[in-house]
């Protein structure tokens, strides 16, 4: 049995499927894909994933893409040390929260990430080179996001994204008043999902929102997450991000 995991820095999508691999104690080959060099759009990588997106799981030559799909695949193939409830009701609750994170959290956090971080990269590239790079991006939506990052997101788009993020953290805060973890009293993929996209860094991303005062249960939950050995190991993974882009402070520095 051979597992290869193609990924970027230990954050967001790449972190979301790396944590389950480690939680389950699965040996895997880590293959770093340098997004800053646009390796995800290089011929060798597009041959693996025609969408030009990380992460990718290669299980004995079978290619699995998209983090929620990868994580469910790991549960099906490697059920030991489960991260999905065994009972149908518990699994349904976990999937509800995963759907919420994928559709209502990730997209809006991503807008701020592209605005504050990717825009710096996009604007640093000469116009001719930028146009050449855009031609190598397989997905139209990704090309659109790169162009938006270069030209800048509108204040209305950013305000709407912030509003949706506030709704999400408030929703999780209310849930944590009822259960120990997001999908119930078990630690599940739903916790990993929200942590990877938002929970691990929402305070640093939006210091002006005073999340610590607004959502104390969320902060306690985040500390439980960060203290998990598998999470700590995943976060210690390779990070080639330029130092000036690593810290979310409400400003791009």
Task: Name every feature range the model reports, one short phrase each.
Residues 1-138, 249-252:
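GST-like domain detector, emphasizing the conserved glutathione-binding G-site
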Residues 6-7, 193-196, 236:
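Short beta-strand segments
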Residues 35-36, 187, 240-241:
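Positions that flank functional sites
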Residues 79, 177-178, 227:
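The C-terminal cap of the DNA-recognition helix in HTH/winged-HTH DNA-binding domains
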């Amino acid at each position: 049995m051979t597992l290869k995991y193609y990924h970027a820095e230990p954050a967001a999508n790449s972190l979301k499927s790396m944590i389950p691999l480690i939680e389950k104690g699965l040996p895997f080959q880590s293959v770093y894909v340098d997004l800053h060099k646009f390796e995800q759009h290089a011929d060798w990588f597009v041959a693996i994933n025609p969408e030009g997106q990380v992460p990718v799981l290669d299980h004995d030559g079978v290619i699995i893409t998209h983090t929620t799909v990868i994580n469910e695949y790991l549960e099906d193939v490697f059920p030991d040390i489960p991260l999905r409830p065994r009972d149908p009701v518990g699994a349904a609750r976990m999937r509800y929260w995963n759907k919420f994170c994928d559709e209502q959290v990730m997209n809006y956090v991503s807008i701020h990430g592209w605005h504050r971080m990717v825009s710096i990269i996009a604007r640093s590239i000469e116009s001719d080179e930028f146009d050449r790079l855009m031609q190598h991006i397989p997905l139209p939506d990704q090309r659109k996001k790169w162009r938006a990052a270069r030209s800048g997101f509108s204040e209305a788009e950013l305000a709407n994204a912030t509003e949706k993020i506030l709704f999400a953290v408030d929703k999780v805060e209310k849930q944590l008043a009822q259960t120990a973890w997001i999908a119930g009293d078990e630690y599940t993929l739903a916790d990993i999902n929200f942590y990877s996209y938002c929970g691990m860094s929402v305070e640093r991303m939006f210091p002006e929102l005073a999340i610590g005062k607004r959502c104390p249960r969320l902060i306690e939950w985040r500390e439980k997450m960060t203290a998990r050995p598998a999470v700590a190991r995943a976060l210690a993974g390779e990070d080639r991000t330029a130092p000036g882009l690593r810290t979310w402070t409400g400003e791009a520095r």
